[in-house]
Structure formats: structure tokens, C-alpha cells
């Protein structure tokens, strides 16, 4: 194994920021993995909720793209990428659309909190480029994703109450 040579392009990029970005890459890949699990759960023949499957597959691809964008940033800033093991999703059975959406909301809030902490670190390390990068590519998108999931959860709860009110249980 050869030792990596020092970067020619690294400037004003603190080691703590580099490490935090590597952790964020792992979290984004984990989120992608969870959404992939959800997608293929809803694609099963005994579940057969194709729109949920498509929605979560799209979310999986988005999260993977977020990780790739962070990896590109690491290279642009002269940092090194250190990939870690990706944790298995906490469950394999997502039960129903409402439960999966609630889990997705918790996941997105966790990702958002991690990004806010990363932004705080970048501010403390006086790294305006990293602050701008996080603000431009992540923070608003996270707020929009959290709002979208909240809306889906509200609508699914209303639909469930409507079905139960008519003496029927939704499939």
C-alpha cells in the first residue's frame, strides 16, 4: 500500500471538515440504502404498491447523488475520501405506506440535522466555500423533502381516517 501524496489543491480545508464530509457521505449512502429497501419492499408481489416503490426508488437515487456530490467536493478541495461500512436498514418489513413515510421523515430529519452540524463546523473553521456549498446544494432541498414527507403523511392519515370512518380498512 502506498502512502497518498499531499494534495496540490488543498487550501483552507480543515481536517475536521474533511472527516465530517466523509461521515456525511456515509449517511447519504445509508439513506439511499434505506430508500432502496423501501422501494423493493413495496415492489413485492404481496405488497404491490407500485407508486410507493417508484417514489422510494427515486429518493434512493437522489441520496446516492448527494453522496457522489460530496465525494466530488472532497476531490475538488484536495481531501481524501474514506468510505465506511454502510449500516443495514433498521428493518426489512416497512408494513405500509404511512409507516414507511414516517420512517422516511425521521431519516430526512436526521440527515438535515447532520447537515446543519456540518454547516456549523464549516462556519467555525472559517470555510465560506463549504458553507456556500452546503447552503446551495443541501439545506433548502432538505427542508423541501421534509415538508413533502410531512404532507404525504398528513394525506395518508386523512385517507386512513376516511376509510375507517366508512367501515373499511385501506389495503
Curated annotation (Swiss-Prot):
Gene3D superfamilies with a match to the protein in the record: 1.20.1260.10
N-acetylthreonine modifications at: 2
E.C. number: 1.16.3.1
Keyword Cytoplasm: yes
Transmembrane spans: none
Residues bearing PTM N-acetylmethionine: 1
Enzyme class: oxidoreductase
Main location, first listed in the record: cytoplasm
Keywords tagged on the record: Acetylation, Cytoplasm, Cytoplasmic vesicle, Iron, Iron storage, Lysosome, Metal-binding, Oxidoreductase
Binding annotation for Fe cation 1: 28, 63, 66
Amino acids binding Fe cation 2: 63, 108, 142
Entry superkingdom: Eukaryota
Localization annotation: Cytoplasm; Lysosome; Cytoplasmic vesicle, Autophagosome
GO CC, one annotated term: autophagosome
Residue ranges constituting the Ferritin-like diiron domain according to the UniProt record: 11-160
Entry GO MF terms: ferric iron binding; ferrous iron binding; ferroxidase activity
Subunit architecture: Oligomer of 24 subunits. There are two types of subunits: L (light) chain and H (heavy) chain. The major chain can be light or heavy, depending on the species and tissue type. The functional molecule forms a roughly spherical shell with a diameter of 12 nm and contains a central cavity into which the insoluble mineral iron core is deposited. Interacts with NCOA4; NCOA4 promotes targeting of the iron-binding ferritin complex to autolysosomes following starvation or iron depletion.
Role played: Stores iron in a soluble, non-toxic, readily available form. Important for iron homeostasis. Has ferroxidase activity. Iron is taken up in the ferrous form and deposited as ferric hydroxides after oxidation. Also plays a role in delivery of iron to cells. Mediates iron uptake in capsule cells of the developing kidney. Delivery to lysosomes is mediated by the cargo receptor NCOA4 for autophagic degradation and release of iron.
UniProt name for this protein: Ferritin heavy chain
Organism, scientific name: Ovis aries
Gene label: FTH1
